[in-house]
UniProtKB/Swiss-Prot annotation:
The organism's place on the tree of life at top rank: Bacteria
GO molecular function: RNA binding; structural constituent of ribosome
Chain's gene name: rpsI
Pfam name, any one: Ribosomal_S9
Protein name: Small ribosomal subunit protein uS9
SS bond list: none
InterPro entries linked to this entry: Ribosomal_Su5_D2-typ_SF, Ribosomal_uS9, Ribosomal_uS9_bac/plastid, Ribsml_uS5_D2-typ_fold_subgr
Keyword line: Ribonucleoprotein, Ribosomal protein
GO biological process, one term: translation
GO CC entries: cytosolic small ribosomal subunit
Species name: Caulobacter vibrioides (strain NA1000 / CB15N) (Caulobacter crescentus)
Amino acid sequence: MTDAQGFDALASLSSNPEAAAPAEPKIDAQGRAYATGKRKNAIARVWIKPGKGSITINGRDQEVYFARPVLRMMIAQPLEVTDRLGQFDVVVTVEGSGLSGQAGAIRHGLSKALTYYEPGLRPVLKPHGFLTRDSRVVERKKYGKAKARRSFQFSKR
């Protein structure tokens, strides 16, 4: 093998790290994959296993926990993108933040759990941004201001 061929092979490995070592599924003894997701101050612990497609959040069905259809749709996005809707039973415990932050945390955790269960789904989920932690949090209030950026009303006289 010449130096040029060796360099090309090395360059292809470094540009595509997933080709170097195929990831193995991370599944526990019960056949479940576990992951955590975060969004704002919400932390979601997500377990997935093959099943009929039920989603249980804090011991309640998703229709009961999230009354707004937009939030339920947000949770189901990773399953829809990967064509796995109705194939996995999802059990979630989530705490902190509000309903929107919790839905975002569940979506993040579910996406990570899907990649742990089936590593081949990572290239499908990554372009949609489901595996990226959304780092936006509330800006703190500053002294001398009414809110984070809003000033008190100014009076000339």
